[in-house]
Amino acid sequence: MGRHFDIGYFKKTLKVRSKVAKERTVVNKMYAWQLGKEYYDGSRLNGYGGFRYDGRWLKLLPKIIKRYKLTKNSKVLDLGCKKGFLLKDLNILIPGIKSYGIENHDYALKNAVKSKSKLIKCEYTKLPFKNKSLDFVIAFNSLYMQNLGDVIKSLKEIERVSKKSYIVLASGEN
């Protein structure tokens, strides 16, 4: 833990998000905090703005797969999986991999893409996995909406379920 690993997240996306953030009103932010239809599939000012599968993780996942030596025998968790796009691409790149997604909001799960991954609704602070049962856990832009106490609990849970404590935490805001 503690080493920097740049997966090369989409630079153009970060520029667009920065511009949109300046235009958001209080009402837009209220929609965003609900993490429902308006956030995922409404206006860009409310959140993702038409959050649809586009295969973007197919370009980034090979770096992660190589770095963490993921194979079809690996067990992977995407914590805060949203609509499951990363997991869908992971299953395309490594057929047969055991992959799980945890999301704590109904709308994203009900509108998730079809994939071989098992998607579970639960809080990030109480993961339904045995100790040291997962080869890799990614928490990408998922913990930032929690209070500090829950962030700490979530990080402890990630460490508890990870065999090697491989964690990728990222935010495109700063």
Residue ranges: model-predicted function:
Residues 54-71:
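Conserved alpha-helix/loop element of class I SAM-dependent methyltransferases that forms part
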Residues 152-166:
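A short glycine-rich, Lys/Arg-flanked "PGG" loop and its adjoining helix->strand segment in the class I
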